[in-house]
Structures are given as structure tokens and as C-alpha cells.
């Protein structure tokens, strides 16, 4: 990217929402202070959001990075960054679910298979355990295993029984069933995670 942020370009790419021009210019200034090249690589993304250097956090954040990286070039530019923030922080429930779907859809083929779902559920379980979340529930034997969560989600959401979750099945299944909504977001949904990490970061 160049050293000037274009308000018109941001509008064309859907990066603007409730943020005004002055706020976006300030974000861009701070973004370039942290990333002079104008793009974030994976290691910079982790530093940007103050991600702990452990396996549990890394797995989840790498999935988050892929969702930010809309063009698949393994970097995040400012427009991708702001567009994602506006979507997950200010978007509708449907928008947030669609974005969460992108995190699960590791190979970007438009469907989520059992292994993709299991990988994310396992990484979030590990991250929550590392943060001592729901330890008491697990000790009491009330917490489902990742495999049990995946089996139940597919039973409730995979309407055509093809072993994959389409975007429509994912969104409608979450809307239809509160348990599915909770499990797909795992109480660690992208919106709340990003909000927490942004508060930890001095960037915004």
C-alpha cells in the first residue's frame, strides 16, 4: 500500500462502517507505525494483538489470520484489517456468523468438514483450558469432548447429511438452536476475542 490512505478506496472495499474519515486516518497512521510496509504478516499479526506465545493461542489466531486475509496472499493490508473489524465489531449476527464460518473453513472450499470443525473446536478447548475457563465444569464431567461437540453439531446442522456444513446450514443452524450457536462460537467468538485483544494492544 502507499503512504496515503484513500477514503474513497475504503468505501469501495466496504471497509468503512461507523468509523468516520478522521478515525480511519488515525487508525491508518498507527497501523503504519506498527507495520511500515503497510501489510501484516502472521508474526506481526500475533504481535499486533498481543497474542501469548503458546500453542493454544497460536492455533486459534492462525485461523483468525486466514479470515482477515480475504485475498489469500498470506498478508493483511489495512483495508482487509478495517473491513474485518467493522464486520465483526459492528456487523449483524448474520455477518458475524458468516465471518466465523470463514475461520472454520480452513481450505476455503465453501464447506466445513468434520476435521475442520474438530480442529477449531479442539484449539478453542485448549485455549480455554489454558485460560482456566470452564475447568470446574470439566471436573464435574459436564463438558462435552470436542468429538462429542462435533458429532452433535453435525447431527443438528447437516441437513442433507453429506458430511459437510454449507454456509447456509452453518448460519441457519446457529440461528435455530441456542446450543449450536454457543458451540459454534464456543464463548470465544471472534468479536469478543478481537475486542479483548484490542484493549490489550496500545494500537487503538
From Swiss-Prot:
Ca(2+) 1 binds at residues 69, 71, 73, 75, 80. The keyword Cell membrane applies. Binds three calcium ions. One of its GO terms (molecular function) is calcium sensitive guanylate cyclase activator activity. In the retina, expressed in rod and cone photoreceptor cells. Appears to be more abundant in rods. A lipid is attached at residue 2 (N-myristoyl glycine). This is Guanylyl cyclase-activating protein 2. Keywords: Calcium, Cell membrane, Cell projection, Lipoprotein, Membrane, Metal-binding, Myristate, Repeat, Sensory transduction, Vision. GO terms for biological process: regulation of signal transduction; visual perception. It is a lipid-anchor. Gene3D superfamilies: EF-hand.
Amino acid at each position: 500500500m502507499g503512504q496515503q490512505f484513500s477514503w474513497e478506496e475504503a468505501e469501495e472495499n466496504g471497509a468503512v462502517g461507523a468509523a468516520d474519515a478522521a478515525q480511519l486516518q488515525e487508525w491508518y497512521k498507527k497501523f503504519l507505525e506498527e507495520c511500515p510496509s503497510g501489510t501484516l504478516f502472521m508474526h506481526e499479526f500475533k504481535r499486533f494483538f498481543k497474542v501469548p506465545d503458546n500453542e493454544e493461542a497460536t492455533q486459534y489466531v492462525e485461523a483468525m489470520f486466514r479470515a482477515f486475509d480475504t485475498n489469500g496472499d498470506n498478508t493483511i493490508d489495512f483495508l482487509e484489517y478495517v473491513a474485518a473489524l467493522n464486520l465483526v465489531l459492528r456487523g449483524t449476527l448474520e455477518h458475524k456468523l458468516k465471518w466465523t464460518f470463514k475461520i472454520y473453513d480452513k481450505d476455503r472450499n465453501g464447506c466445513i468438514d468434520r476435521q475442520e470443525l474438530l480442529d477449531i473446536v479442539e484449539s478453542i478447548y485448549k485455549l480455554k483450558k489454558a485460560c482456566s475457563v470452564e475447568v470446574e465444569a470439566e471436573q464435574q464431567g459436564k463438558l462435552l469432548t470436542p468429538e462429542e461437540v462435533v458429532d452433535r453439531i453435525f447431527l443438528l446442522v447437516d441437513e442433507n447429511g453429506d458430511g459437510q456444513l454449507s454456509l447456509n446450514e452453518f448460519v441457519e443452524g446457529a440461528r435455530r438452536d441456542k446450543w449450536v450457536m454457543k458451540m459454534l462460537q464456543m464463548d470465544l467468538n471472534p468479536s469478543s476475542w478481537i475486542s479483548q485483544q484490542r484493549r490489550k494492544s496500545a494500537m487503538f
